[in-house]
Amino acid sequence: MNYNNFVLELKRLKLTVFSLNDAQRIINKKRAYTSVYLSRFIKSKRLVLIKKGIYALPSSLFEEIATSIVESSYITMLSALYHYSIIDQQPNDTIVFNSSISRKLDIRIPDGAYRIKLVKITPKRLFGFERIDTQNGYIYIATPEKAIVDALYLPKLCAQSYIEDALLDSDKIDIKKLINFANAMESHVVLIRLQLLFNKLNITGYDKFIKVKRIIPKKFNLSKITTKKETKLNYIFGDSDIR
């Protein structure tokens, strides 16, 4: 099969990012032959090697690549909020939640250079994302509400100021949906962080929906905590990722 026909078949299958196994099925050749076949196109820059066994068309969108590196993965946190035009600044790193590996990858395609942070989390917390079809492929990306909840789950990976701005300046956030996702995370600390964030931003009327064991007082003063409480607050606000 020549290159043009191979690309047409990839696009028909919406596989702008594909595996060696995918290519083998398309050209119907043995694995060793398929590997050599793809190597020729990589050398001529008609394909991009993402990592061992994963390839992409040069025209692939970065987001398509980010969610095709490992199965059951999706873009989240600031990159998701940027995708929905909830924040204006594109983040340097793209956070991708998955159930397999934690790893950093630097990707270079004709469109530019990007860094992906694959973050492994438990499978029960891989929810709240959707498939969005592109012209020739697709991406998996968190809803705005789940992107915020994921940021509360691992706050070291996302500055709180961006989350505050998203909640204050956007009409694209469904607060009840946000709370439902937070409850579904089954993380007490996520709920406390959300409650404190609501208190700070004066988002009221939702305490009864947050399934936390203890309600944080609205007048909770962080500047007057005791030394004994400091460790616990570090745990709550993200100096620790214990959940």
Stretches with model-predicted labels:
Residues 129-243:
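Hydrophobic alpha-helical interaction segments
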Residues 31-40, 101-109, 120-122, 136-137, ...:
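Short, mixed-charge, low-aromatic patches
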Residues 33, 89-92, 206-207:
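Short, surface-exposed acidic
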Residues 16, 30, 87-88, 204:
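Short coil/loop linkers at secondary-structure junctions
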Residues 28, 85, 153-156:
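Hydrophobic/aromatic-lined pockets within catalytic cores
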Residues 44-127:
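Short gly/ser-rich loop at a beta-strand->alpha-helix junction or flexible surface loop bordering the NTP-binding
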Residues 1-78, 171, 175-178, 186:
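Short beta-edge/loop segments at beta->alpha junctions of small alpha/beta modules
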